[in-house]
Structure formats: C-alpha cells, structure tokens
UniProtKB/Swiss-Prot annotation:
Annotated GO MF terms: mRNA binding; rRNA binding; structural constituent of ribosome
Gene3D superfamilies on file: 3.30.300.20, Ribosomal protein S3, C-terminal domain
Keyword Zinc-finger listed: no
Source species of the chain: Clostridium novyi (strain NT)
Source organism phylogeny: Bacteria, Bacillati, Bacillota, Clostridia, Eubacteriales
NCBIfam families listed in its UniProt record: rpsC_bact
Protein name, as recorded: Small ribosomal subunit protein uS3
Gene field: rpsC
PROSITE patterns, A to Z: KH_TYPE_2 (PS50823), RIBOSOMAL_S3 (PS00548)
Any one GO CC term of the record: cytosolic small ribosomal subunit
Alphabetized SUPFAM superfamilies for the sequence: Prokaryotic type KH domain (KH-domain type II), Ribosomal protein S3 C-terminal domain
Job of this protein: Binds the lower part of the 30S subunit head. Binds mRNA in the 70S ribosome, positioning it for translation.
Domain KH type-2: 39-108
Family: Belongs to the universal ribosomal protein uS3 family.
Entry coiled-coil feature ranges: none
Amino acid sequence: MGQKVHPHGLRVGVIKDWDAKWYANSQNFADNLIEDDKIRKFVKKRSYSAGIAKIEIERTAKRVKINIHTGKPGMIIGKGGKGIEELKSEILKMIKEKNVIINIVEVKRPETDAQLMAENVAQQLEKRISFRRAMKQTIQRAMRSGAKGVKTACSGRLGGAEIARTEQYHEGTIPLQTLRADIDYGFAEADTTYGKIGVKVWLYKGEVLPTKKVRTEEISQ
C-alpha cells in the first residue's frame, strides 16, 4: 500500500522534518493550527506565480517565524524589500502575535523540486499545452538535473474527454516503501475549461542514510 501513503508523512521523523515547528497547550493548539493553515493558504494564493515550494512556520512565546521556500525570490521580496513589508502587514492582520519574521529561502534547482514541477505542469495545462508533452518534458528536465527517478500523474478530463481518467509516466526508480529513500512529492491543480485536472509528482533524489559498514581493525603484533 505504499502507493496510497503520502511520501512525506511516512518519512517524518525518519529523514523528513516537520513544516510546523512549535508546541502549544490544549487551549492554544487549535487556534495556532488554524492560523498556520490561513497563513499557508494566503501566502500561496497571493504569490502563486512566484513558485512557492514549501512554507515552514516556527513559533515561540511571542514570535512567529515564516520561512518561504521559493524558486523566484525577487517576486516576493519586491523592490527594496517593499513586497516583504506588505506581506508582513497583511499577515499581522490574520494572527494574534504582533512580532512576525519572514525569511525568503531560494530554491536553487526548481527543476528538481516536486511541488514546483507539479505547478509547472498545471500551468502548462492551463495554457492548453498537451498533458503528455508537459509531463514528459518535466521528467526529462528532472532526470538531466540528477534525479534518480520521477513519476508524474494527471487525473481528470484529459484533452477534453467526456470520461475522466488518469495517465502516468515515469522514468528511473521510485522506491516508495524504502524509508531511507529521499522521495519528494508535489501536488497541484489546473483549472481548465473542462474542469480541474490534478497533477501529482514523485521525485526520487537518492538514499539519505548511509549504508552500515563493518569496521575492520588491524591487529598489530
């Protein structure tokens, strides 16, 4: 059943880290969780064209730190940091804390980030580019950039067909049940004239934990 489990959720605490890093008591936990969801949805919607791969939120007693991983940092930062200040003021209206720190982290290789790959395919589908062409080109770019394996899947009324279906393409290996395998996963939706098309991307980058080696000791006489 490895096909049905989210690759990140299966590996959290093993080789993946949490996107939300904070602790709260039972009274504040639900409020913080709702705030995190609002922040993520707002930032994603506001800066969708900037190619946001991941949003990490860290909380302390009186501070909220937001790390935004993006392929186009200039679009969020703006001229002279104006974009950051506007984003900060808008987030402050949504949450209780008055001290918000926003860090922009550049994704050096967007072609090997599963979320950005999925969003790229979705944007091409919205421009009426063939789904087969979009998927195959995305796989080829990732493999040329050093990925060990890539799988893409598109679901919906592909090509305007009356009956919805799912089509998949893959290249290389994707060991979903190997916990030490660093598998990135991304999901995006394309809004087309025929309805929504879901895009999923699995990207295998290699094993994280080194293999155990038997130590050999030389016995000097």
